[in-house]
Amino acid sequence: MSAAVACLDYFAAECLVSMSTRAVLHRRATDPEGASAAAVSEVGAVSRESAGKGTGSRGVLWIPPVLQVPTPSPGEGDGAPHLLAASALADLSCGAREDFREDSEEAPCASTSCFEPTWCSSPTGGSEPTQAFFEDELSDAESSCSDSAILDAPEASEEPDDSGEVPEGPPGARPAPSTGPTYRRRQITPASKRHQCSFHGCNKAYYKSSHLKSHQRTHTGERPFSCDWLDCDKKFTRSDELARHYRTHTGEKRFSCPLCPKQFSRSDHLTKHARRHPTYHPDMIEYRGRRRTPRPEPPPPAMVESSGSDSSSSSGQETSFTACL
């Protein structure tokens, strides 16, 4: 019974070893010893051929097979070395698949030297554990992959990054002036007669719109300003004309002559009258309710002659008085 169990365990271990070397070998003879020897020889041959050709998928860790595994005898109660190797292969195969999934998400190693198969011979005595050997191989492979990845890493580009930093210019250069919106003062143009009459054949233009409206009433005949005096139905086109007419009813004469006591109700009548005086000057007349400073009037010629005679007589008296003394 123990021999049958040992044979089944050995066959399972053989299957694991063959699966790890990717060799399809399913030969089982009647004699377990002969079968084990044939399997070991076939496994060694296939693995050597694959190692010589250098085949193997990139990115997957290749695990070297355990060669020349001794066949357990029916008398021995435990096939510890062979079963330990099989269990190590099973654990490492699971670990290799997990590592491959992690490496597929990250950047793969650039160099292929980290996956080259290496040959080694297991101890015949079976006292040294095989699992420690595979752990050392895995650690060496990972370290070689990391070193090659660091060596093959691209150098940092010397181009300036987009971090927002402004490269420094020459020491004597000044920063460029800001190109913001510049406000210019509006040029003051001289006043022009922009308000032109729109009636056909009339080319008159005015500075103010109110003047244009009063002028257009001459074309339309409109007279919106009417006198409200009793029994007076006169109408006017301008308000100043109405005010002038209203003074005829009240008898107000606010424009007085500066050279005589006469008064007038209209400023043009006053100007016409003042020009008749020989000593008249335009600054003497009130202008829009304000009297301008009049020029000093020259004395009349009779007064000048009399003052000259008085001074000459007084000087003669003084000379005679001094002569008498």
Curated annotation (Swiss-Prot):
Q: Which SMART domains match?
A: ZnF_C2H2
Q: What ranges does the record list as Low complexity composition bias? A: 306-316
| A GO molecular function held by the record | DNA binding
Segments carrying the region annotation (Disordered) are 153-196, 270-325
Write the record's keywords in alphabetical order, separated by commas.
DNA-binding, Metal-binding, Nucleus, Repeat, Transcription, Transcription regulation, Zinc, Zinc-finger
Q: Where is the composition biased (Acidic residues)?
A: 155-165
UniProt family annotation? Belongs to the Sp1 C2H2-type zinc-finger protein family.
Protein known as: Krueppel-like factor 14
This chain is encoded by the gene named Klf14
